């Protein structure tokens, strides 16, 4: 054997971060319906029952005795932060693995918008969270401050407005954007709609400020038609679909053994 190769290089692992791949994975976190056991769901109005139940009943129907935000910081939020960092670094932003996803300004803008959307629902469910000092472990800040919800809402509105102004409608993103297929107009509408949602909730405690923020977001133009809805499309392919096959198998056993059981558990 004359050329054994380099055993310290894994040919199956990328040598450079690809921002398109980082963004695709971050987008997968919008599909969940609630937050529990490392899943993110935007319907935070349903979650207080999970949080309060364990104070009264250790084992209840909700089955949510523990929870953590670690997966959201580790994956979608961190991925978006890395996209922002790569596209802001003069030595990185021009590399093929970066620019193939789209122009730098739009990458930063969509990453900030998606982060804002996720942060909004996390703080709505949990209140204080690390925001201003998040992602500073590289600077040896391992105990970030938990910002108040008031601070987070103010920062989210400001950061989302900055992101909105960064969008370049003459540019686009690649198909790595699995939510809007690179449509910058759609991302701008989601950005403005997220700010409107923040403002409506803020108005419950600060009507004047909520009204002011809403007016600005509304003027920017939010989602007004179904064509611009935030949708997560699942594949119809069920080949090798383990859980789907398991459901079919178990249901068939119920039908065979005792059909009335299906009515009871449905």
Model-derived segments and their meaning:
Residues 50-130, 136-175:
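Conserved, well-structured interaction surfaces
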Residues 154-229:
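Internal, well-ordered domain-core segments that constitute the primary functional module
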Residues 140, 177-185, 230-253:
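Carbohydrate-binding/catalytic loop surfaces
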Residues 1-55, 63-64, 71, 89-92:
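Membrane-proximal, proline-rich intrinsically disordered regions
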Residues 254-266:
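Single conserved hydrophobic/aromatic residue that forms the stacking wall/gate
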